Amino acid sequence: MSFYEIETPLIAKHNVGKALRAMKETIAEDKLPGYIVARYEDVKNDYRLMQDAMMRGLRDDKIDEVYADIMRKVYGAGLDVLIEEKVKKYSSFAYARVSAQQTEAHPDAVRTVLEAYVQDMAMMAFEPESTRKAKMEKLTADHHAYMKQLFNALLVAPMWNDRRAADFADLLLSPTIDRDDALLLVSAVMLATMNVNDPYKWDMLAEVYVRATDKVLKMRALVGWVLSLPYNPRGPRLFPFVQERIKAMLADKTTLKQMLDMQMQMLFCCNADADNEEIQRNIMPTLIKNTNLQMTRLGIVEKEDDPMKDIMDPNAAERDMEEMERKYRKMMDMQKQGSDIYFGGFSKMKTFPFFNDLCNWFAPFNAAHPALGAARERLAGSTFLNNLMENGPFCDSDKYSFALAIAQIMDRMPDNVKEMLNSDATLGPTVSKEEQENPAYICRSYLQSLYRFFRLYRSKRDFLNPFILDELEDNDGNALFMSYKLLACPEMEENAVALCGFLLKRKMMRELMSMAICYKSSQNPRLVRFLALVPMTDGKWQEAYDLFASVPEDQHTEESLRGMAHCCMSLKRFGEAVAIYRRLLAMHPDSFSYQLNLAVCLMSSDAFSSCGDASSCGDASSCGDASSSCGASSCDASSCDAAFSLGGKVEARPNKVVEEGTKLLYKLDYEHPNNANVRRVLAWCMMLQGNFDKAIDIYMRLLSQPDAVSADRLNAAYAHWLSRDVARAVALLREYCNLCEQEEAEAKEAAKKQGRRCEPTKSRNYRLVEDFTKDADLLSKYGISLTERKIMVDIVLNEEEF
């Protein structure tokens, strides 16, 4: 038995009896501490009293409240069981349990120690100069040892109650304790609550966030309560104050803005490996090539200038400097956008003994930290540590790494480099005081420290990792916290819109799908257009259309109309699509993409509404400005893939409508003679009309261009096949399959770098059968039977052995 077998009856069924029976079995199977058994006995006795009262025929008007209170007590006892499971399974929790036995974690006792430390530090000013340094170092070391034990004690602390949560909140907000102590304890409670979801500890973090006036404490508390939110939306029903607290916080616009910034920064952290690869491949080689320092066995020395270089190429130095500045600006731009540019370098510097202690990963940077004693000695007379603390552009974790690393190589540095340590230039671009007080910067810095812990700590698998986008293992979380149902409410919809745009821009379609599932009942037109991208990506056009249609007519935006028109084209509702594009052109008469789409719809309407699947060739919505709004991969009309079949009898076209479409199409070709999308549509229309030679001519010109796409080869193959040049069609189909496989490999590599699951690879057979099925109307119209399609697949695959 386990905690989850105790929790399930409570969360899913609200059944005390089943939960108590599960706990009884757990106690019988496992050797649990006496305090858990005692807690179980107390709850069991309370429940028996309720049963006895009912047996005697007594009625209690507050029976539901009493029953709910007993459920909460059982849940608390279950959390204690979960802690014991972690103590037995994970070394970090086992060590914390041993360490916790030496510390009293009651808030009153903690307050006494923390306030005494502040007072003792203040009294150091009155100590004689000769003894002050030694006494301060001892006081700091003793206090650090206490904080380490307290951190561990909070990690394995049993479930709190409302009184203890309130007392700890008051303590952490008190001006009479050191701020660094408060910051470290917030992290301890966060780590504990993430792994053992105590609603009272969570509420304490939320209370600190709401009441804190210190920006650093406030943002650390924000990260704390967000990352320790319960995944199961049913859980907070046992503790209504959780939902009430969330509702109250989400009513504040500042909180919403800070949550959105935090969510985006978490996704940037998740992309740290890809950013590091970009820096190592395209930026660092240039910066290293142009440095005048080199490492030798004797230390760092300056390289001598090459006298022949100025003679042979007098402009080389200037070009090198310009190139180095350009690469450096690119790296700084990445940082400004949110990229974690320092992770790659500092990830190699987390092997110092300092990082063996769990609490040190969460410690705010302090030059007086006991672990920096050797660094302070070696850097005596240098302002480096103070500059690092006050102006360093790194997160706290990296500041410790930098200080420890510099201290190690100090003796091997040339004198001029040692002198540089006294200037801010050593740290690269420093951070202004104003920027350091920006909540977004504070949050980003803290998240980067956390990311390093969850990626690099030696026992990282002991803890739930909130920086995972896919839940791959038991101890993985979900970095996309805004997809939690607990946060899905009208107040969050504007945040959801902004986040969906962010995800779409980075082609994170799986994460976009998670948001769609969370907000599937929304009628916000700006949000609906993003939610519809998920079924559109899977080719579920009717489902996407229904989402757009759910928006009240008077609330449609340009984006929702554009998406609805795309669905209509794919569903072969060309008449409806024509009406929508006319409406869009009334907004933007000169829009190229709207005119091109209208032309396609006009030439596809009425007599052609009974033809095959419509998708990308006819949809020019991906051309020009519309690409930013549609975005689903299957909606990429720029490829003009042959899945869009305008089939039907040519002579059945309504003359006036087709004439309008033809004129518009030739007008666009005249105005945009080099536009590939116009040429694709023209080629497709030529093929539909049986003008295969003209279609082939256009497709060959398209294939000769560097912006040709894989679907151009598929369409060109169709044109050759329909003109009975089968050999050329086979060659083009093989090229098409090769390109598709190359594109899939690149997409997989990109997904791997971002830590996301990859879509399954399509076999060549599957791909060709899928394409031929989509375009069956076109192929059948010109006499390509199902049998011929099967044979063509075998020819392309070269399957001669049977």
Range-by-range predicted roles:
Residues 363-555, 559-566:
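Alpha-solenoid helical-repeat scaffolds
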